[in-house]
Swiss-Prot record:
UniProt key word RNA-binding: no
Protein name: Ferredoxin--NADP reductase, root isozyme 1, chloroplastic
GO CC field: chloroplast
Cofactor: FAD
InterPro entries, per the entry: FAD-bd_FR_type (IPR017927), Flavoprot_Pyr_Nucl_cyt_Rdtase (IPR001709), FNR (IPR015701), FNR_nucleotide-bd (IPR039261), FNR_plant_Cyanobacteria (IPR035442), OxRdtase_FAD/NAD-bd (IPR001433), Riboflavin_synthase-like_b-brl (IPR017938)
Subcellular location: Plastid, Chloroplast
Coiled coil stretches, renumbered: 349-373
Inducing stimuli: Up-regulated by nitrate in roots while down-regulated in shoots.
Catalytic activity: 2 reduced [2Fe-2S]-[ferredoxin] + NADP(+) + H(+) = 2 oxidized [2Fe-2S]-[ferredoxin] + NADPH
GO molecular function annotations of the record: copper ion binding; ferredoxin-NADP+ reductase activity
Disulfide bonds: C196-C201
Length: 378
């Protein structure tokens, strides 16, 4: 079943809903990630690929752009059973061969660069938890090691353990295409382009992809307290793990996880066209105003209070008193994105702490000791 990327009113059959009915029809405005009709069509499996067993589901809903108060019942619930975090089920020497389901550009024409949402079918063989990463081995030979494969590239998983089709068989990645421009000529140099990101963004439905993992425990979503506060800070594709958190909190009907706390997302990007999953997050804010807050920093469109560019650390400073009070009360705080985001954020937090008469070094030590501090930068 191919879903149109053009925004329109349509009905889609979803898996069993919370009310127990075997099929329900939910009307949504759009199935794509963006309202930008200029973009290329969403790539999906054709009937031939499905007949080969790439996708054997009569009902496929790759993503819901808008939140619905009627949550989707996910399967298989056995994915909730393991007590131990799934780690390194597949390693670089023996990766798992998965299949590309779809590739979709999810930024607008004025975004500096291209970012794609990529759905991968692992057929339930590479289970993972929210906040973990997959490794991807692009095809070809490592130029620095003739005869050897390329090095593994890690990507944070942008879906819950049930995937975008809610059946535990897929995982989604949020990938920015890495392109190199010569600083002297200003021209693109394809020889220095990111091998793995370009492979993924150029992939077609049915293409094979070698994956490793899952890996990582630092960004796992703590679920022992459903009333906990989670402060999530990201730049660009660093929003990937938070999409997984938020879908688990607000979109999926998971019997053993009924979130009733506060999730607060700070997202820093260049401009409005660079916002990732914006409509999805806006839907949560509309449906769950008491449980979800969403603040954006658009560096090329907004100014901070000093008249400079608005970065995510400026938003943190704007709400610093509230953030510090939440941290004092046990809130978890997460950082994901480029390494370059951390110095500015750390400087801001240190300055705010000093203004409050606190030692940031002591506070940070305590946050780490209490396992409230989660950082994954690249």
């Amino acid at each position: 079943m191919a879903l149109s990327t053009t925004p329109s009113q349509m009905s889609v059959a979803l898996p069993t809903r919370i009310d127990g009915s075997s099929r329900s029809m939910i009307k949504v405005q759009s199935i794509s990630f963006t309202d930008k009709s200029w973009g290329p069509p969403l790539l999906r499996l054709d009937s031939k690929s499905r007949s080969l067993g790439v996708k054997k589901r009569s009902t496929i809903c790759m993503s819901l752009q808008q939140s619905s108060k009627s949550k989707v019942l996910v399967t298989p619930l056995e994915l909730e059973d393991p007590k131990e975090t799934p780690l390194n089920l597949f390693r670089p020497k023996e990766p798992y061969t998965a299949t590309i389901v779809s590739v979709e550009r999810i930024v607008g024409p004025q975004a500096p660069g291209e970012t794609c949402h990529i759905v991968i079918d692992h057929d339930g063989n590479v289970p993972y938890w929210e906040g973990q990463s997959y490794g991807v081995i692009p095809p070809g030979e490592n130029p620095k090691k003739p005869g050897a494969p390329h090095n593994v590239r890690l990507y944070s998983i942008a879906s819950t353990r049930y995937g975008d089709s809610f059946d535990g068989k897929t995982a989604s990645l949020c990938v920015r295409r890495a392109i190199y421009y010569d600083p002297e000529t200003g021209k693109e140099d394809p020889s220095k382009a990111g091998v793995c990101s370009n492979f993924l963004c150029n992939a077609k439905p049915g293409d094979k992809v070698k994956i490793t993992g899952p890996s990582g425990k630092v960004m796992l979503l703590p679920e022992d307290d459903p009333k906990a506060t989670h402060i999530m800070i990201a730049t660009g594709t660093g929003v990937a793990p938070y999409r997984g958190y938020l879908r688990r909190m607000f979109m999926e009907n998971v019997p053993n996880f009924k979130f009733d706390g506060l999730a607060w997302l700070f997202l820093g990007v260049a401009n409005s066209d660079s916002l990732l999953y914006d409509e999805e997050f806006a839907g949560y804010r509309k449906d769950y105003p008491e449980n979800f807050r969403y603040d954006k920093a658009l560096s090329r469109e907004e100014k901070n209070k000093k008249g400079g560019k608005m970065y995510v650390q400026d938003k943190i400073e704007e709400y610093s008193d509230e953030i510090f009070k939440l941290l004092d009360n046990g809130a978890h705080i997460y950082f994901c994105g480029l390494k370059g985001m951390m110095p500015g954020i750390q400087d801001t937090l240190k300055r705010v702490a000093e203004e409050r008469g606190e030692s940031w070094e002591q506070k940070l030590t305590q946050l780490r000791k209490n396992k409230q501090w989660h950082v994954e930068v690249y």
